[in-house]
């Protein structure tokens, strides 16, 4: 699957509402949609200029809706053409603790992800992120045209 537009990505993110993680240890947050919104909101507060980092926190639950395998790798593969290599790298490597030890971006993403599991605050709604997704996709599109 390849996302061709922010609208398609928004549809996938909306489909994550009400989705439940697999049972068992490390199954993930109880509400992946809300968790992703909280993660992105925490990153927005801490790193307001880093839209790609915020978006990486937002799109993480998408992989659970796609074919079997590693959800982080699926998400990275699906968002890369639309959102760029950096977002895909952050999403893919976030699931591997050894990868984020020496990477400040991954450490920030992981910290926000962990905090969002227990944080209880109004993180807004998904529609609040449409403009950030569009800006990130447009920036990636321009960069891709230059390559």
What are these regions (language model features)?
Residues 1-147:
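Metal-dependent phosphohydrolase cores
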């Amino acid at each position: 699957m390849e996302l061709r537009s922010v609208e398609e990505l928004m549809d996938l993110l909306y489909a994550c509402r009400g989705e439940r993680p697999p049972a068992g240890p490390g199954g993930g947050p109880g509400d992946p949609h809300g968790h992703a919104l909280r993660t992105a909101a925490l990153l927005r507060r801490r790193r307001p200029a880093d839209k790609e980092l915020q978006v990486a926190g937002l799109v993480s639950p998408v992989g659970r809706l796609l074919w079997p395998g590693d959800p982080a790798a699926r998400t990275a593969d699906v968002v890369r053409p639309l959102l760029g290599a950096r977002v895909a790298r952050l999403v893919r490597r976030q699931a591997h603790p050894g990868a984020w030890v020496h990477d400040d971006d991954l450490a920030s993403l992981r910290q926000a992800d962990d905090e969002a599991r227990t944080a209880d605050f109004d993180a807004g709604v998904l529609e609040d992120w449409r403009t950030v997704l569009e800006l990130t996709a447009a920036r990636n599109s321009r960069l891709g045209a230059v390559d």
